[in-house]
């Protein structure tokens, strides 16, 4: 009599496949990295303040000092935007993330360009500086609007980049109060606003690193 062989029943005691870590967990920033980034931003800001405050002779070439200050400040801004981008401050939407990527690229690219400035022809450098300065400030302002609008970060670090980028309000206020002849006062207000705002932002990264890391 013929017999029919049936396949053995499937095993139910097989160990489960290990779960693959989520991509978001792999991208999460640790509080230590955020604190280190904040400390690096502070160091670069100190370089910016030092070389901006150094007295330069009227008949000397002050470009080197201005260049070092510009590189240091652009790099400090790039660190903040890089942490915000990696830490999820721009959210998951493509539009604001594209803004963050573009701002970081503009800031990092400007820092690299200004770093090689002394070896470039002077005419080319002067023309490029007319583009890089508004590009850096404009890119940072747009990124700061994104951080504030998306709202993934909480606490001072959410609003401080936007306050830093709002330097025209301070400069215009100084001019309105003191008159159009206060060019030097307006310049000091501009530099002071940028330095103070960026310093507070870097301190916020250090002090609030744990909460910022939880949003990444």
Which role does the model predict for each range below?
Residues 2-9, 13-216:
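Hydrophobic, aromatic-enriched alpha-helical segments typical of multi-pass transmembrane helices
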